[in-house]
């Protein structure tokens, strides 16, 4: 189970051989109590769930001290949760070949501890890590998207410009070729005219 608040310490036990109804009778006594008071209550409560909760609270305290750096005297039980687990089905023989069903119930336990001081140092570290993870603001992402769109549009327009330049180059080459052909034809006509004029003079 993931918790957003990093000021919490959690410990859990699963498939304990006790019904959820009987375990909740003890869980009600622990909510909102200090850890020292809760352990004292469990020591004087003669219920099957008492040693289970004692073991679970000690585990949660160890997690709070080692993982979060909390002090033992500042820990409070925020929640003591008991959920139903899988049920084992057994049968008891009865008279005349009959059998009756036996339901052996199990339960899942969870204890959540919180510090009275709120763990300000842990909150600051968590906020710093969040700031490091946030690399771009929404405005930067929008500007980046626009720049990507413009970059994507530029290569699409470039081929069209290239085609236009190729067409203009082809037209220019054809016009220059036509001009050179006309110039060659004019020079040939001038040469033939001069030859004819010389022949007439000779005659």
Swiss-Prot record:
One of its GO terms (molecular function) is rRNA binding. One of its GO terms (cellular component) is cytosolic large ribosomal subunit. Coiled coil: none annotated. Keywords: Ribonucleoprotein, Ribosomal protein, RNA-binding, rRNA-binding. Residues 138-203 are annotated as: Disordered. GO terms for biological process: translation. It comes from the Bacteria. Residues 168-177 have a biased composition (Low complexity). InterPro entries: Ribosomal_uL22, Ribosomal_uL22_bac/chlpt-type, Ribosomal_uL22_bac/org-type, Ribosomal_uL22_sf. Residues 138-167, 183-196 have a biased composition (Polar residues). PANTHER family: CHLOROPLAST 50S RIBOSOMAL PROTEIN L22-RELATED, LARGE RIBOSOMAL SUBUNIT PROTEIN UL22M. Belongs to the universal ribosomal protein uL22 family. Part of the 50S ribosomal subunit. This protein binds specifically to 23S rRNA; its binding is stimulated by other ribosomal proteins, e.g. L4, L17, and L20. It is important during the early stages of 50S assembly. It makes multiple contacts with different domains of the 23S rRNA in the assembled 50S subunit and ribosome. This is Large ribosomal subunit protein uL22. It comes from Mesomycoplasma hyopneumoniae (strain 7448) (Mycoplasma hyopneumoniae). The lineage of its organism: Bacteria, Bacillati, Mycoplasmatota, Mycoplasmoidales, Metamycoplasmataceae. The gene is rplV.
């Amino acid at each position: 189970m993931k918790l957003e608040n990093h000021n919490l310490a959690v410990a859990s036990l699963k498939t304990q051989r006790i019904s959820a109804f009987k375990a909740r009778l003890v869980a009600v006594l622990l909510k909102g109590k200090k850890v020292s008071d809760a352990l004292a209550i469990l020591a004087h409560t003669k219920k099957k769930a008492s040693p289970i909760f004692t073991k679970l609270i000690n585990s949660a305290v160890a997690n709070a001290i080692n993982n979060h750096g909390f002090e033992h005297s500042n820990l409070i039980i925020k929640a003591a949760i008991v959920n139903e687990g899988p049920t084992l089905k057994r049968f008891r023989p009865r008279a005349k070949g009959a059998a009756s069903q036996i339901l052996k119930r199990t339960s899942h336990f969870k204890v959540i501890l919180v510090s009275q001081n709120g763990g300000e140092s842990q909150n600051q570290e968590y906020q710093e890590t969040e700031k490091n993870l946030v690399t771009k603001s929404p405005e930067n992402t929008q500007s980046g998207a626009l720049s990507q769109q413009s970059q994507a549009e530029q290569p699409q327009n470039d081929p069209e410009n290239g085609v236009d330049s190729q067409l203009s180059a082809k037209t220019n080459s054809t016009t220059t070729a036509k001009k050179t052909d006309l110039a060659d034809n004019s020079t040939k006509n001038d040469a033939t005219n001069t030859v004819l004029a010389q022949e007439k003079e000779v005659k």
